[in-house]
Amino acid sequence: MFAVIKTGGKQYRVAPDDVLEIGKIDGEPGTIVQLNEVLVVGGDTPVLGVPAVAGASVAVEVLDHKRGPKVIAFKKRRRKNSRRKRGYRDELTLIRVSEILTDNAKPTKGPRPKKAKAEAPAADAAE
């Protein structure tokens, strides 16, 4: 099953367990957020929204907030000694798609537990 979601003015094709970077959304790392603007729900019988699919949403887990690469906007007017240099970095959110929900369903999966450190078993093997 897949879905096409719209967030931050962009559209993304997502499936469960996909990890992607999108424009910044509210939510602390480790929490589940629902994205309600679903344009298409695909599977055995695809459903196209007009413009959005009624009652459909995508539950995503917020993994991290970070900043994207620096983008430089440089303008120069030749022979005028006129230059302007501006730069910015986008605020991004790293998310993992938990599940695709239809019929106004609530998310059933919670955030994934963090992995245990691999150093603990190595210390036991040395004894």
Swiss-Prot record:
<comment type="subunit">
    <text>Part of the 50S ribosomal subunit. Contacts protein L20.</text>
</comment>
<dbReference type="GO" id="GO:1990904">
    <property type="term" value="C:ribonucleoprotein complex"/>
</dbReference>
<feature type="region of interest" description="Disordered">
    <location>
        <begin position="102"/>
        <end position="127"/>
    </location>
</feature>
<dbReference type="InterPro" id="IPR001787">
    <property type="entry name" value="Ribosomal_bL21"/>
</dbReference>
<dbReference type="GO" id="GO:0005737">
    <property type="term" value="C:cytoplasm"/>
</dbReference>
<keyword id="KW-0689">Ribosomal protein</keyword>
<dbReference type="Pfam" id="PF00829">
    <property type="entry name" value="Ribosomal_L21p"/>
</dbReference>
<protein>
    <recommendedName>
        <fullName>Large ribosomal subunit protein bL21</fullName>
    </recommendedName>
</protein>
<dbReference type="InterPro" id="IPR028909">
    <property type="entry name" value="bL21-like"/>
</dbReference>
<keyword id="KW-0699">rRNA-binding</keyword>
<dbReference type="GO" id="GO:0005840">
    <property type="term" value="C:ribosome"/>
</dbReference>
<comment type="function">
    <text>This protein binds to 23S rRNA in the presence of protein L20.</text>
</comment>
<comment type="similarity">
    <text>Belongs to the bacterial ribosomal protein bL21 family.</text>
</comment>
<dbReference type="InterPro" id="IPR036164">
    <property type="entry name" value="bL21-like_sf"/>
</dbReference>
<dbReference type="GO" id="GO:0003735">
    <property type="term" value="F:structural constituent of ribosome"/>
</dbReference>
<dbReference type="GO" id="GO:0019843">
    <property type="term" value="F:rRNA binding"/>
</dbReference>
<keyword id="KW-0687">Ribonucleoprotein</keyword>
<keyword id="KW-0694">RNA-binding</keyword>
<dbReference type="GO" id="GO:0006412">
    <property type="term" value="P:translation"/>
</dbReference>
